[in-house]
């Protein structure tokens, strides 16, 4: 597998990628319940972290659709370095939704033209609550500017039709009828599906997502026949059924839950060891992932597995991929790609000389 970086400079931009039933995110969203007996599962956009190696990992564990991190359109269309660093993909990275932060039609259309050959859909970020983004008219600012948001959706659908899917990921308003009105306008503008994060602009992630709000919105736009995905507080497989049955959503988008346990949609209650081996392999195989980002991914997964804190600290003190792999080899039965059992482990495979560490870890869990 080779990664594909988006071309830079004055080059001929290919036509949009050909959508098939197997890669069409809208078709998957509408039919997953019938074909797989479950709602659709989606790995949402994660700032810096939903890069190619992690997307590949999520796909291994029953994730149907995966998003890129948010990419700022104004930087991407004007800056060659942004195009090199912001998006890498390959032929197996599908269905892929590229999320964009944008505040005008011109930048959006140019951005879509550049990324459409490499993805299956575009997601407009209307949910980021960061003040700097809101000041730029990006993210959450767009749910208060429905005319601009709908004009951007309409412009993309007018140019590409069903050759490219477009989604909006929104937060809810304090007054839910405002969100209903926004969603109805988006449906009329041609949006293919809407993802609703069940929190307002000011709601902290520590507060529960408002599933009643998502349910209310879905009930009041049901005549539009546009699928809705619920986002917020999905941390285990049972949450998928619980959230969709309660709200009426077609599926669930998980973010924080997948960051710590990429296998949650496969029914694992904690991150299996196989995720560690696979992620390390893909991070090195694909290249381009800064070491500190890989380190953070591994920290989240190993913390979820309740690895001893002293070992987590040792890992976080490492400075490069070479020392990281050496540490894994010395501390665990760490399998490489091609070896029997690679990526199949569940429990942490401490080496025999690490039995003291293992015992200490068990005691620490009990405490």
UniProtKB/Swiss-Prot annotation:
One of its GO terms (molecular function) is tRNA-dihydrouridine20b synthase activity. GO terms for biological process: mRNA processing; tRNA modification. Coiled coil: none annotated. The keyword Flavoprotein applies. Its EC number is 1.3.1.90, 1.3.1.-. It comes from the Eukaryota. It catalyses: 5,6-dihydrouridine(20a) in tRNA + NADP(+) = uridine(20a) in tRNA + NADPH + H(+); 5,6-dihydrouridine(20a) in tRNA + NAD(+) = uridine(20a) in tRNA + NADH + H(+); 5,6-dihydrouridine(20b) in tRNA + NAD(+) = uridine(20b) in tRNA + NADH + H(+); 5,6-dihydrouridine(20b) in tRNA + NADP(+) = uridine(20b) in tRNA + NADPH + H(+). FMN binds at residues 45-47, 99, 169, 197, 231-233, 255-256. The active site is at residue 128. This is tRNA-dihydrouridine(20a/20b) synthase [NAD(P)+]. It comes from Saccharomyces cerevisiae (strain ATCC 204508 / S288c). The lineage of its organism: Eukaryota, Fungi, Dikarya, Ascomycota, Saccharomycotina. The gene is DUS4.
């Amino acid at each position: 597998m080779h990664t594909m970086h988006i071309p830079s400079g004055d080059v001929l931009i290919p036509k949009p990628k050909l959508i098939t039933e197997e890669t069409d995110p809208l078709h998957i969203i509408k039919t997953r319940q019938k074909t797989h007996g479950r709602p659709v599962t989606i790995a949402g956009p994660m700032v810096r972290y939903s890069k190619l190696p992690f997307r590949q990992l999520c796909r291994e564990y029953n994730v149907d659709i995966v998003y890129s991190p948010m990419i700022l359109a104004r930087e991407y269309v004007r800056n060659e370095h942004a195009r090199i660093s912001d998006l890498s993909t390959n032929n197996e990275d599908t269905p892929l939704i590229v999320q964009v932060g944008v505040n005008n039609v011109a930048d959006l259309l140019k951005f879509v033209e550049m990324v459409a050959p490499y993805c299956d859909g575009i997601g407009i970020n209307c949910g980021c609550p960061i003040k700097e983004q809101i000041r730029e008219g990006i993210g959450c600012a767009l749910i208060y500017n429905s005319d601009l948001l709908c004009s951007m959706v309409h412009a993309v659908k007018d140019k590409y039709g069903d050759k490219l899917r477009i989604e909006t990921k929104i937060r809810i308003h304090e007054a839910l009828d405002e969100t209903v009105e926004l969603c109805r306008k988006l449906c009329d503008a041609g949006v293919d599906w809407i993802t609703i994060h069940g929190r307002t602009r000011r709601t902290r992630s520590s507060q529960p997502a408002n599933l009643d709000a998502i349910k209310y919105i879905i009930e009041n736009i049901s005549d539009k026949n546009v699928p809705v995905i619920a986002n917020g507080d999905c941390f285990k497989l049972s949450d998928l059924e619980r959230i969709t049955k309660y709200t009426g959503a077609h599926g669930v988008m998980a973010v924080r839950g997948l960051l710590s346990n990429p296998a949650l949609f496969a029914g694992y209650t904690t991150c299996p060891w196989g995720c560690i081996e696979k992620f390390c392999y893909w991070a090195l195989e694909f290249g381009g992932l800064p070491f500190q980002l890989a380190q953070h991914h591994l920290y989240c997964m190993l913390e979820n597995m309740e690895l001893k804190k002293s070992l987590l600290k040792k890992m976080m003190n490492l400075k490069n991929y070479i020392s990281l792999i050496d540490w894994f080899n010395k501390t665990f039965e760490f399998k490489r790609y091609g070896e029997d059992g690679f990526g199949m482990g569940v429990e942490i495979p401490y080496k025999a000389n690490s039995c003291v560490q293992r015992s200490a870890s068990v005691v620490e869990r009990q405490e």
